[in-house]
Amino acid sequence: GTGFVLWVPDVSHVAVACTNPENMEEAVYQMEQHPQDATVWQVHIPHKMIGYSYEYIIEMSNGVLFRKSDPYAQASELRPNTKSVIAPVSKHSWSKTVLQRKKIQNKDHREKPMAIYELHIGTWKRTAQGGFLNYRELASELIPYILEMGFTHIEILPITEHPLDESWGYQTTGYFAPTSRYGTADDLKYFIAKCAENKIGLILDWIPGHFCVDEHALALFNGGPLYEEERLERRANPDWGTLNFDVQKGEVVS
């Protein structure tokens, strides 16, 4: 089966709306509060739903309804769509990559200095049709260039999900899924493995300090400040047009 669990306190009802990718029909399943923690809502659906898109329907005490993507989703729809996606279990094995990473980490960079090549995947290179390279195509295009130019490391601007193609990726909407612009999580794992195979260190930018204000994501998740700062004067990050996390809450920092 398929289980859904969501932390969302101070609301009246929660449901999960799941869309079948074959016929695009949506089914709505009501969630129940956890018997030991009323801030957590859950439901178990007795069949597999790999590939289904889904979002949560949250009802406030005043009857207002709104929809949210899953903060912990492992995959997302391709923009401009915003639903989360139930991803298949990964078939990728890290055993060989772990050994190769240790060899990279054990290098003495006093003898061979680090040379880091930083890039944004979406603007580094495009396909002949003007589209984005996927992670596998990036591996075949970028790694030979890095080796030829003598760089020791690649640093990639944020690869977590974000709404705008024009963005560098610093306005995050989901922290547990690589953006679907460039392929699947297994495609990304392939790229990481190829870097390790070629003894190239890899740095992935990750932005835990602030998050996107888009209404389908973390902002005002239960109708009020939940993931963001409750104190209005500390909530907004005007330099980025984002919201700051409330690090006073254990559920947020965990």
Residues covered by each model-derived region:
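Surface-exposed extracellular loop regions of Gram-negative outer-membrane beta-barrel proteins
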Residues: Y29-M31
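The feature marks proteins involved in alpha-glucan
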Residues: G1, E25, P35-E118, T123-G130, ...
